[in-house]
């Protein structure tokens, strides 16, 4: 009723009514409901958002990523950052162009079981099965890749131009997107506005603003006063009022920065790009000195009187870091069996541990050069206090013991060894792949050698399809633990000074005991850190109008008591479990004669 259709095919069991203008050049699937819409049309040969250039990281261009339906965070990372390999970039662009042209059409499609209700203009948009579009203002030149396993919801007041929205995502409540890619199971709402940005799996954006950002998996920003601009993030939480500057009022907005995985910002933090913040670090205050702390992960960056103070490694003992690592896998909302991004959640991996080895060397060298009694050390335009430096070396060594011990226990589990030779054979890696440097390609942790092998394949033309590129990333993700052991075994020899030909059960027992000390020591620090949340100062403001006892009672009713807190009991259980795990291996091999 009240519908004008031009060059439209309609599937079975559809209801289309009250279209103010018309629907033109569309194929509409079955069981679809379209009501109270202004106009739906395709007015030219369209690629539906595929092939649109997104000027990510550098607002003035130079790092453009070509959007496509199959875009993964890892593919985009290489396209944006590996500009030192122009042949690779040209090949990747032509692969993306081939895909875009293959899917170009002058006829749009609306899938099966789609609902489009009370919506304004839909122009040059391809809409997948089971999609809900309700109260949306305008959609122009894009793809909504909804499907039965992971429907997409686009809600009231949304305006999207030049976009792709992947399966399972929800874009709602006045969100405005221009030249944006939205990955799987993202949630954007509450008037969020973004331009020239890429959001990959499980990102959340509410209230604030994004410009030219590369938001890797689990980038979360919830606050009205937060602007993320020209930065690369992943597993990141932005505090309210966090922003960055990419403009120094000289040659325009040409600067960019990186916050490596797990870095987060406190309220009112500010960073003047260019800068690079190490993995799992916390940024507090205003930082204008362009520090690069990528080799000092798990740090605090604190500003005092316009100076950046660095507290290396301290975040390793933070209860918040452990809580973050536990929550990300639980918050992976992707239901689509065909996942675009391969996400490695490990807190300690060859990627972070290699940085700790470097960090430990840097701190020891600072100590040697400036002298052990120096009160303040300078590194990368940041200051490090003497006590912080010594603690940093200790924290990094604890984490290295923990990671290498974990690896060796995993490698030797479930086998009853009779001789040292059997142990040596089991310790030998299954592959040479994994030696050398490792990289975090926006969520995927892999040996640099494997990434380079893929890039060489793209350059010489042996890898020439989007699905082949994604299959290579899948293979690296699949083989992570095999590659990890190759790297870990090499580091075990180096760190503990062992020879693979003469390693004995007693050497292994020594490593396991060091591991037990590290794990229990770290857990105790985390336990003490959690205890601070139950201190008297944390009770301030509880028990309104009451006495001291009522304050404690009110606090316990709301927050529970320390000993029965679920996180605290989990830490205590972790200490027990890990001690038992180490003892089990020691018992299994202690009888072997040297």
For each predicted feature, which ranges?
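N-terminal cofactor/phosphate-binding cores enriched in small/glycine residues
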Residues: 1-3, 7-12
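Glycine-rich hexapeptide-repeat left-handed beta-helix
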Residues: 9, 15-98, 134-135, 144-148, ...
């Amino acid at each position: 009723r009240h519908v004008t259709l031009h060059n439209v095919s309609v599937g079975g069991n559809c209801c289309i009514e009250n279209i103010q203008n018309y629907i033109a050049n569309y194929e509409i699937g079955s069981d679809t409901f379209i009501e109270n819409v202004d106009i739906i049309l395709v007015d030219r040969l369209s690629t539906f958002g595929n092939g649109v250039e997104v000027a990510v990281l550098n607002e003035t261009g130079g790092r453009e990523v070509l959007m496509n339906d199959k875009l993964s965070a890892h593919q985009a990372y290489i396209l944006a950052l590996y500009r030192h390999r122009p042949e690779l970039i040209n090949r990747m662009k032509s692969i993306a162009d081939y895909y875009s042209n293959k899917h170009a059409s002058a006829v749009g499609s609306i899938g099966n079981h789609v609902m489009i209700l009370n919506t304004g203009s839909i122009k040059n948009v391809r809409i997948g099965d089971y999609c809900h579009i309700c109260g949306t203002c305008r959609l122009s030149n894009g793809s909504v890749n909804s499907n039965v396993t992971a429907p997409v919801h686009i809600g009231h007041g949304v305006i999207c131009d030049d976009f792709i929205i992947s399966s399972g995502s929800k874009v709602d409540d006045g969100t405005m997107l221009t030249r944006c890619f939205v990955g799987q199971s993202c949630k954007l709402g509450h008037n969020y506005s973004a331009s020239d940005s890429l959001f990959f799996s499980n990102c959340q954006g509410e209230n604030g603003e994004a410009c030219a950002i590369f938001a890797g998996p689990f980038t979360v920003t919830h606050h009205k006063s937060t602007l993320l601009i020209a930065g690369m993030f992943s597993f990141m939480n932005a505090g309210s009022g966090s922003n960055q500057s990419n403009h120094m009022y000289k040659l325009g907005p040409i600067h960019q920065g990186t916050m490596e995985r797990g870095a987060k910002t406190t309220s009112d933090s500010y960073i003047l790009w260019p800068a690079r913040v190490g993995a799992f670090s916390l940024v507090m205050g205003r930082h204008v000195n362009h520090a690069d702390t990528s080799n000092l992960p798990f740090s605090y960056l604190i500003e005092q009187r316009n100076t950046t103070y660095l507290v290396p490694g301290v975040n390793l003992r933070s209860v918040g870091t452990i809580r973050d690592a536990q929550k990300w896998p639980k918050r992976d909302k992707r239901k689509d069996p065909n996942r675009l991004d391969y996400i490695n959640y490990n807190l300690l991996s060859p990627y972070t541990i290699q940085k700790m080895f470097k960090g430990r060397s840097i701190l020891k060298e600072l100590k040697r050069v400036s002298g052990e009694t120096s009160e303040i050390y300078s590194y990368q335009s940041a200051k490090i206090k003497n006590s912080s430096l010594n603690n940093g070396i200790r924290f990094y060594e604890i984490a290295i013991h923990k990671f290498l011990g974990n690896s060796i226990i995993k490698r030797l589990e479930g086998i009853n060894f009779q001789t040292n030779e059997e142990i040596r054979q089991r310790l030998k890696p299954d592959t040479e792949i994994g030696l050398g440097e490792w990289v975090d390609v926006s969520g995927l942790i892999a040996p640099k050698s494997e990434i380079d092998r893929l890039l060489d394949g793209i350059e010489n033309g042996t890898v020439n399809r989007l699905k082949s590129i994604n299959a290579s990333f899948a293979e690296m993700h699949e083989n992570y633990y095999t590659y990890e052991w190759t790297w870990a075994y090499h580091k075990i020899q180096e760190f503990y000074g062992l020879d693979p030909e003469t390693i004995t059960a007693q050497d292994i027992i020594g490593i396991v005991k060091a591991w037990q000390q590290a794990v229990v020591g770290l857990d105790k620090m985390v336990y003490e850190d959690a205890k601070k949340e139950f201190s008297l100062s944390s009770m301030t403001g509880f028990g309104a109008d009451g006495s001291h006892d009522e304050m404690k009672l009110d606090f316990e009713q709301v927050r529970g008591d320390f000993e029965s807190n679920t996180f605290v009991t989990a830490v205590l259980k972790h200490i027990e479990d890990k001690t038992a795990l180490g003892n089990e291996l020691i018992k299994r091999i202690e009888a072997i004669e040297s």
